[in-house]
Each structure stands twice: as structure tokens, then as C-alpha cells.
Amino acid sequence: MNRKLLLVTLMVTMLVMQPAEAGVWDWIKKTAGKIWNSEPVKALKSQALNAAKNFVAEKIGATPSEAGQMPFDEFMDILYES
């Protein structure tokens, strides 16, 4: 009897918690989307992208535009050798 009661209790708990949990995850997703698309985060992403481009260009000894024109295999060979 205890197993059946435990099973019923778990099933009812799951049915009650699923909509509440879905609401929490929806709120987290919506809030994260707002933060990700905010102006300060866009500025930080831009700075990080520029820093990464400059680092790679310095590492391979080319300007960022030259690095963008290189074939991928050549680019990876240069990074592997240095």
C-alpha cells in the first residue's frame, strides 16, 4: 500500500509542479534574452570580438582583414606552428 500511495503522491506532485516549473523557465528565458540584447552587453560583445580579432591577427602576424581572407587550413597551420 505504501508504494502505491507514494506513486500517487509523486504523480500528483509532478502534475502540480510542471506548469509552475514551466513558468519559471519561461521567465528565466525571457529575462536572459532581454539581458543578452541590452546595450551594455552588446558593447561588451563587440569589445570581446575586437579583442579576439586583434589577438589572432597579432598571433599570425597579419592585419584582421588579411586574417579574414586566409584559407582556413593555412590559418590553422599558422596558429598550430606558433
From Swiss-Prot:
Residue ranges the record assigns to the propeptide: 66-82
Disulfide-bonded cysteines: none
Domain of life per record: Eukaryota
UniProt keyword Transcription present: no
Entries under InterPro entries matching the protein: Antimicrobial_7
Keywords: Antibiotic, Antimicrobial, Membrane, Secreted, Signal, Target cell membrane, Target membrane
Tissue-level expression: Expressed by the venom gland.
Cell compartments where the protein resides: Secreted; Target cell membrane
UniProt keyword Signal, yes or no: yes
Leader sequence segment: 1-22
Protein role: Antimicrobial peptide with moderate activity against Gram-positive bacteria and Gram-negative bacteria, as well as low activity against fungi. Acts by inducing bacterial membrane disruption. Shows activity against B.subtilis (MIC=4 ug/ml), S.epidermidis (MIC=64 ug/ml), S.aureus (MIC=32 ug/ml), E.coli (MIC=128 ug/ml), K.pneumoniae (MIC=64 ug/ml), P.aeruginosa (MIC=64 ug/ml), and C.albicans (MIC=128 ug/ml). Does not show hemolysis activity.
Similarity section: Belongs to the non-disulfide-bridged peptide (NDBP) superfamily. Long chain multifunctional peptide (group 2) family.
Entry domain remark: Forms an alpha-helical structure in membrane-mimicking environment.
Protein name: Antimicrobial peptide Smp43
